[in-house]
Structure formats: C-alpha cells, structure tokens
C-alpha cells in the first residue's frame, strides 16, 4: 500500500472533486442511485447476519451487544468498496470534496449545491429501492429474530435527542471523509480497500449515525411494520443526521485541511518524474518570482470571472506555437504601474537569467483545466498534452535545476515562513512542431525526430491573494531597491572588470 503525503493527497482530493463537476446531471443522479442501492444491499447483508444472533440472556447461544454490533460492522464496508471502484456518488463523501473545491475556488456554489442535492436525493431513492425490492419483497427479514432486531435498531435511532443524533452524525461523517481521503491517497486497489475498511468499521461499532445507511434501515423497518412512524423518523433522525453529516464532512475534515494546505498548486505538467522542492530550501529564483507576483501580478478573481491580461489566451495554452509574452515585460494592467526601468531591474535581478521566461497564468475558470505552455530550445513553444489543473500564478521556465541553489536575499524570505507554498518542480518534455521537424542537415528524412527531451524545469508559484504566508505590507520600493542591489552585486561578481 502506497500512501501519498498530505499535500499530495490534498491535491488529489481537489482533482477528485473537480471531476465530479464534469458529470451530466442525469449521470450524476444515476450514480447516486447506485450508491444508495449499494448501501442498501450491504445494510441488508449486515442486518441478516447481526439479526440472526440473539442478545437475550435467556438464550444459551446469545451474544453480547458488542459482538452483534461488530458482526454488523464487519460487512458494511462492502458498500463503500463498491462505491469507490464503480465511481458511484455518495453524498457524505461529497460534502468534504466539494467544499474543499469551493474554498479553493475550483467550483461554484451552484455546482456544489447541484452535486449535493442530486447525490442526496439519488442516495435516498437507491436506498428506498433496496429496502423495498431487495429486502421487503423477498421476505428474508420477516422472521421474528430479524424483525426484533430491526425494531430495536429503529427504536434506538429515534429515541435519541436532536443534539445526540447530531453529534453522532458529526463523528460518523468524519470517519467517512477520512476513509475517502485515505482512498484517494492510496495508489493500489489493496491499499484503497485496507485504508477504507477500518474507518467504516469504526463508525459502525461506535454507533454513529450515517444518513444514507439510515435511509435504508429506517425505511426497511417502516415497510416491515416495526418502525415508529414516518414523521418521527424524519424529525428525530433524518434531519439531525443530515445536518451532522454535513458539519462533520465540511467542518472537521474539509475546512480544516483546506486551512492547513491552502493554497496548493495543482499544475500537472507532462513530466517523467516530479521533484518536490523542499519548503525550506533556499531558492532565489523561486523567491524573486514569488515577490514579483506578490506585488505586481495579482488577479482579483471572482466566481465566474477571470481577471486576466489581454494575452491570457496565449498564456493558458490556447496557441501551441506563438510564444507567450514575457510576464516581466508585459504591458497589461497587472504590470501597468511598473516603469520600463523597474521591469528591467527585476528581470536583471534574477540570478544568471535563470527565469528569463516567466508566464503569468490566469486563474482557470471553474473546472480549472488549462494547458500551461512550456519552452524547450529558444523559440520553441508548445503545450503539454495532459490537462493541468491550477489556481493561477507564474510559470517560470528554468534552464537548469542548479539555478535554484542560490541563496535568496529577498526580504520576503526572512519575514515569511514558507512563502513559496506548494511548488512543484517538474522536468519538461517538449514536443517539437512540424516545422521544426524538418531536417537540419541534408540527407535526413523530414520528421525524423518528432520528439526531443530538454533538461528544463518549470516552477509554478501561486498568487499571493490566496497565500496566507506572504506578507502584504512589504513596500514595492523596498523590494525594487533590494532587487537592484542584488542585480548589481551579481553583475560585479560575474564581470568584475566592467567596474574599472
């Protein structure tokens, strides 16, 4: 079993949630119905097993309540295994994933509401179908032992106070969302099964309240005539359980880990081997570009609106051959308050010209897919074939990883703990255009070299508007002065004779 580290798992959770918004409503609803059916089928199997064991002390073969509860819990994870591996939509897990995407501005509130409503109603319909067609009509649970078990379970669930039921539901969906997190972080089937099994068993043994499981159990009890009544079930169980599940998934898991990891750069480059940068590793390249975007490259992104420079379409990869404009020299609104001399000073301030080609990437529209361009040899711009999901920022083409080893003199490095956020350093693989495949020497066939690998890397820096660690009070003038001093020192070190 291979588990991704927490930041990587968080990135996967975001991508997992974004994919849910791509589903058509009819398919979303159908998958939600199937999830409800899977929960109902597992609930039927658990009830058939646990109800077959008596807890009456007068019975010599009686088992304890704890044993009966564990028998029920041991089979219930089968429902979640079916849901994960078939791609069905379970409302309780969606509370976490969709909220994280909403807080990251990857989905709209409307998309979240559509997903929640469709998945909840579909889960209810699926659980109702399973309770009637798979449990009630076959008559498997109509013997006295199973009816007595159903009656006890229904009575216990509806005798709880509103606060008790709410708190039990909070704990339940915390376990469920952690199971979803573990599954997303796992890379193999066995790891997914093992990582989800124990949280699901735990919430069943703990007696927590799961709204979809209660849909099946209480509706099944009502159909068999051992339930307390429809109104009592809705008011005493369904409503507090639903609210508690939402609070548990959104509050104790989704919002907490969004706060811990936000912002995360989810730029998925066409890379052979992603190389994560150490948070504390000195990197003047990373820092200078982060400072640049911090002061002059912000985007005031609002839901449904992309506040981007005029060349945003090119920067977003819409053109495969035309080179994007250099963000350091752009004349758009993001850099309008910068004089030509200041822009030149910033460009020269990057040690060794390591990041001469910096691209301002606009925040993607909701759904978040764009193709960030990469550069191979000089003048050869292209876009990777794999879609990337990102929050916008500055993409910098770095000619050599050695450029990242210089020590930063930026004031932001001293005043902020981790100003670079979740950066990814990836080796780029560049596809040459058809015009560039023409033979450079006589005797070679046209198109003989369709691909070339270039030892180049791409940095992605998130905008400061969505970064809690970079202080906003740093003055532009002080940064420009620091950058000019750094540029002069660098020039003196590289060309000492020029000062004579």
Curated annotation (Swiss-Prot):
Whether Iron-sulfur counts among this entry's keywords is: no
- Basic and acidic residues biased stretches: 428-444, 466-485
InterPro entries to which the protein is assigned, alphabetical: Aquaporin-like (IPR023271), For/NO2_transpt (IPR000292)
Pfam family for this entry, one? Form_Nir_trans
Sequence ranges on the Cytoplasmic membrane side: 1-31, 91-113, 186-192, 259-500
Activation/inhibition comment? Inhibited by p-chloromercuribenzene sulfonate (pCMBS). Methyl methanethiosulfonate (MMTS) inhibits L-lactate but not formate transport. Inhibited by the Malaria Box compound MMV007839. Inhibited by BH-296, BH-317, BH-326 and BH-388 compounds.
Q: Spell out the reaction equation it catalyses.
A: (S)-lactate(in) + H(+)(in) = (S)-lactate(out) + H(+)(out); formate(in) + H(+)(in) = formate(out) + H(+)(out); pyruvate(out) + H(+)(out) = pyruvate(in) + H(+)(in); acetate(out) + H(+)(out) = acetate(in) + H(+)(in)
Cellular component (GO) terms are: plasma membrane
Q: Which UniProt keywords apply?
A: Cell membrane, Membrane, Transmembrane, Transmembrane helix
Q: Does the keyword Cell membrane apply?
A: yes
Task: Please give the superkingdom of this protein's source.
Answer: Eukaryota
Task: Show the segment(s) annotated as Disordered.
Answer: 411-500
Mapped to this chain, the residue ranges on the Extracellular side of the membrane are 53-69, 135-164, 214-237
Q: Where in the cell is it found?
A: Cell membrane
Check the record and name the Gene3D superfamilies matching this protein. Answer: Glycerol uptake facilitator protein (1.20.1080.10)
Q: Which GO terms describe its molecular function?
A: high-affinity secondary active nitrite transmembrane transporter activity
Main location per UniProt? membrane
Q: Which GO terms describe its biological process?
A: nitrite transport
Transmembrane ranges? Answer: 32-52, 70-90, 114-134, 165-185, 193-213, 238-258
- Tell me the impact of changing residue 93 to S: Reduces lactate transport. Reduces sensitivity to MMV007839 inhibition
Protein topology in the membrane:
Multi-pass membrane protein
Further facts? Inhibitors modestly slow the asexual reproduction of parasites. Frameshift mutations that are likely to render the resulting proteins non-functional, have no significant effects on tachyzoite proliferation in vitro.
The similarity comment for this entry is: Belongs to the FNT transporter (TC 1.A.16) family.
Stated role: Monocarboxylate-proton symporter; active in acidic-to-neutral pH range. Transports L-lactate and formate.
Instruction: Relate the assembly described in the record.
Output: Homopentamer.
- In Swiss-Prot or TrEMBL terms, this protein is called Formate-nitrite transporter 3
What is the organism of origin for this protein? Toxoplasma gondii (strain ATCC 50611 / Me49)
